[in-house]
Amino acid sequence: MKVVKDMIPTKPHDVIWTDAQWQSIYAKGQDILVAAAAGSGKTAVLVERIIQRILRDDVDVDRLLVVTFTNLSAREMKHRVDKRIQEASFKDPNNEHLKNQRIKIHQAQISTLHSFCLKLIQQHYDVLDIDPHFRTSSEAENILLLEQTIDDVLEQHYDKLDPHFIELTEQLSSDRNDDQFRSIIKQLYFFSIANPQPFEWLNQLAQPYKEENKQQQLMQLINDLAMIFMKAGYEELQKSYDLFSMMESVDKQLEVIETERMFITKAIEGKVLNTDVITQHEFMSRFPAINSKIKEANEGMEDALNEAKQHYDKYKSLVMKVKNDYFSRNAEDLQRDMQQLAPRVAYLAQIVQDVIQSFGVQKRSRNILDFSDYEHFALCILTNEDGSPSRIAETYREHFKEILVDEYQDTNRVQEKILSCIKTGEEHDGNLFMVGDVKQSIYKFRQADPSLFIEKYNRFSSSGNESGLRIDLSQNFRSRQEVLSTTNYLFKHMMDEQVGEISYDDAAQLYFGAPYDEVSHPVQLRALVEASSENSDLTGSEQEANYIVEQVKDIINHQNVYDMKTGQYRKATYKDIVILERSFGQARNLQQAFKNNDIPFHVNSKEGYFEQTEVRLVLSFLRTIDNPLQDIYLVGLMRSVIYQFTEEELAEIRVVSPHDDYFYQSIKNYMIDEKADSRLVDKLNRFIQDIQKYQNYSQSQPVYQLIDKFYNDHFVIQYFSGLIGGKGRRANLYGLFNKAVEFENSSFRGLFQFIRFIDELIDRKKDFGEENVVGPNDNVVRMMTIHSSKGLEFPFVIYSGLSKKFNKGDLNAPVILNQQYGLGMDYFDVNKDMAFPSLASVAYRAINEKELISEEMRLIYVALTRAKEQLILVGRVKDEKSLIKYEQLAVSDTHIAVNERLTATNPFVLIYGVLAKHQSPSLPNDQRFERDIDQLNSEVKPRVSIVIDHYEDVSTEEVVNDNEIRTIEELKAINTGNEDVKIKIHQQLSYDYPFKVNTMKPSKQSVSELKRQLETEESNTNYDRVRQYRIGVASYERPKFLTQTKKRKANEIGTLMHTVMQHLPFREQRLTKDELFQYIDRLIDKQLIDEDAKEDIRIDEIMHFIDGPLYMEIAQADNVYTELPFVVNQIKVDGLTSEDEDVSIIQGMIDLIYESDGQFYFVDYKTDAFNRRKGMSDEEIGNQLKEKYQIQMTYYRNTLETILKRPVKGYLYFFKFGTLEIDD
């Protein structure tokens, strides 16, 4: 049935839908592909289409199959549909059809394709001859089982020692191991199972190596790509020749160029390159120098001389790419090697087939399935042996009135085959509705095949007369005009079918549709010129991180967010900002930069989990328990905070027996040495006993219980919770425990297997990801990868890391894989022990390079289209010469030349190369896209502000003002006038506790806790009971709904007053009341306190303090530090002599410390209320208050005296009483 326009209802004037959206909702009668650009409302359209099929066409919801990409999107889709059905039912309560839908929605097939396949298998398991009580394998189980399968298969082939297998191992294994060989087998496994017929795909891999016609096709493909570079080289050489021809005394240069012109003319004549000429060509070792004589003869033409030489250098680099990448060997050699490689490739394919079969058997024996089994078993149910739809498939065809597929660009060929089995009709009369955007296809690493979308996009038409119907949703309801028009301009000159795999034409571009006001927010393209190592101690990446922090500050201080619903502005907050990068490689630098600037920052990284200190500690423990003969992990455990062996102690142990193979042997030998330090021997005895205890425990208990025992025995959770970032550290430790629980629920058991599982994850670079401890509404700046940002939107997007090179590492592998073309293997001469490129490896390497750049372009598109208000692009260069080079990228018609795009090294080359051209006044017309951008229409007119910043200019040293916060981290930068004191303070506050703490005692206590403990002990209370309470009690943050709507409690007002006092400026000209109000307003602007806090701040009490003598004494002090944290050893503070006494690490926070004439004072603020009993004098009240805080103040004073090695005085300041001096 054809789509008839009359079948689509007339669109009323008052509906919100665009014409294209309206058509997408109501069109039917054939397969429909909706190309939905970013922000075009595709989800809303999909939901509305489902609803209208139910309401208008009386289709039951359970007769629609809706396929989404994730379980989360499936749940959201189902919820939206259910809500709309309920709304319709309330409006028409007597409608029986709607009443039925409210029941049937619970059986509706709105799910991922994997979920649909699983349901299919559960209903038709008899066709597969499998046990119906199967379960889904865990990640750990699947990884280990595949590894074990590869072990078994390779072992079988090692036993056979087939000559071709020997050649493969010689080529793909190293002298030490066969890791690379195994990795290639795994890659081939995953590539093959992404096809409907894995064995058939594998069997075809050797065909190009055998069949001459396929080799000729590969030669033509290489020729076409090489010709692009050779012609570009010819143009560069011609430009060089033209410039040198205008000059004097350059005969030698012209002679060289003339020789090269003869060569390249001969190489590119005809349609086929002369490969013999190219392979045999040799350049002059050095181009004739442009000496002073030439410069004198061409006075005033220095720039032209340099430009002529640059064109020649560019020509040479282009020819060298062709020579090295495409024709390092002549055509005859390339084809001859293919014949010799054929049996080797066939044997490799056979190994992978053996792995697939054996892996299937292993899974069957355990009665488990993985996600690829879901797809292949479903396909087995839906197809006959000849590939035609089965009887079961026919029943599903009859059942489903329509199949709707979201994110169609991310499907693979197996999924495409499944859909084709259950859809009805052909494309011209089918019932398949597909929504997606190929410009956002960024999952090639998961075997997503964007060519499926592209093929349909090119085949379907907007009229739908010949095949399927194509509808373009191009209107964007997310972003401001500046974001859209700049994105359009960039991609119109960067993306086409040659590089990008799709033409960015009028249908593909974005059109402004959001109801923003007319305030201009141009895209910022920021180029950061690095400071040299002479001018900065920071690396380029660290400089960029600091630069990004400055952009965030600028947004917070100057930008507003427009609410499209109300038409009002609000101030920008941290949660409005996201930093997007290609990967998490810059995460650590950004975390440090934001931490240094006290800006809340969160990165939910999928990388770096195994690098976290707390995780490394536990893994060292597990590896040591499994095998203590691993020196790195054993010593790491000994040096850890748990056992605290010093470097001196480790050296002392090693010196006794320096020739031992393992450090564990050295420990044993030291313990029996007559001259050994008895104290160290005792310490080692306790350590060895611990190891043996845990080894015995691990023999009978699962891994997660071993981890739990380690946590409890040594208070690991409590210790790491007390450090900076304690929430995240605690979550990471629990995350590792949970992974161990999941592992034990698989068919694998034991410590060794768990460690192997972890090692495999690390080798695959497949992290768990740091545990997420931040909610969606938390006011923090977020960093995420472009992949994880897909589908999200943010008012402000900082797209950084643009200068990071594209990852082309896979292109250098000895085996190149391509889903469409197959396998390209280098030729390895076993006798010469040398590898050479083969015809297939050269061709597939070139194809993969092109596809890689295309996917990187799509990633750029996704990043740019996340922004609502403003987009900030950040790239980094060594010097401004690089920027000039980018501006001068060659232009071919309306695009950056193909050769420039294929050789681009990073996104910044492309982005800056396009957007900077129209703003470069000196650029010749042949390097521009247009002479005047004002002639462009609004949809493609770039609105971009280009800023070039030198790091030296934007990185001013932090100036310490009287009213700034002094923290431990800033002590290095503060000039106290007493360097010895400063060094001692820093060393003591950063001190690593060297002695083993009794593991049954808390590892860390606050001064307040010690105060309670000592008060309790003085009352003869049992210590263990107090410790149990202190460790076990939960400390929860007060929920926001309580703090926002209820009157503040006394402790909250106390915290608020401390925050105000922490930032209070001290100056000899006292603050006035108006200035105090202005200061509080600044704290609200900086979000240090809530806006409604003003009414709870006791202004009069603070003014009383400001007008008092203590304020003036502090204002006149030599140095002032506020909110100074400390972590010290209780032994040092209390003067204890034995490490076996009840000791802990003490932590606390001193409100203020100041120094006057060499004397240090501390001040502790108190907001306590007190009862003045009748007849009590001020002196009596003061004594009562001092007695109440005597223990706490004693610890503060002793702590500071321990650190500073000098007497310290202190004050208690009560806002409701006044100043009390601490007694000696």
UniProtKB/Swiss-Prot annotation:
Binding residues for ATP: A36, A37, A38, G39, S40, G41, K42, T43
Domain UvrD-like helicase ATP-binding positions: 15-480
Top-level taxon of origin: Bacteria
EC annotation from Swiss-Prot or TrEMBL: 3.1.-.-, 5.6.2.4
Cofactor: Mg(2+)
Residue ranges constituting the UvrD-like helicase C-terminal domain according to the UniProt record: 497-791
GO MF annotation terms: 3'-5' DNA helicase activity; 3'-5' exonuclease activity; ATP binding; ATP hydrolysis activity; double-stranded DNA binding
InterPro entries linked: AddA, DNA_helicase_UvrD-like_C, DNA_helicase_UvrD/REP, P-loop_NTPase, PDDEXK-like_dom_sf, PDDEXK_AddAB-type, Restrct_endonuc-II-like, UvrD-like_ATP-bd
Pfam families for this protein: PDDEXK_1, UvrD-helicase, UvrD_C
Catalytic activity: Couples ATP hydrolysis with the unwinding of duplex DNA by translocating in the 3'-5' direction; ATP + H2O = ADP + phosphate + H(+)
Record flagged with keyword ATP-binding: yes
Role description: The heterodimer acts as both an ATP-dependent DNA helicase and an ATP-dependent, dual-direction single-stranded exonuclease. Recognizes the chi site generating a DNA molecule suitable for the initiation of homologous recombination. The AddA nuclease domain is required for chi fragment generation; this subunit has the helicase and 3' -> 5' nuclease activities.
Family: Belongs to the helicase family. AddA subfamily.
Quaternary structure annotation from Swiss-Prot or TrEMBL: Heterodimer of AddA and AddB/RexB.
Protein name, per record: ATP-dependent helicase/nuclease subunit A
Record organism: Staphylococcus epidermidis (strain ATCC 12228 / FDA PCI 1200)
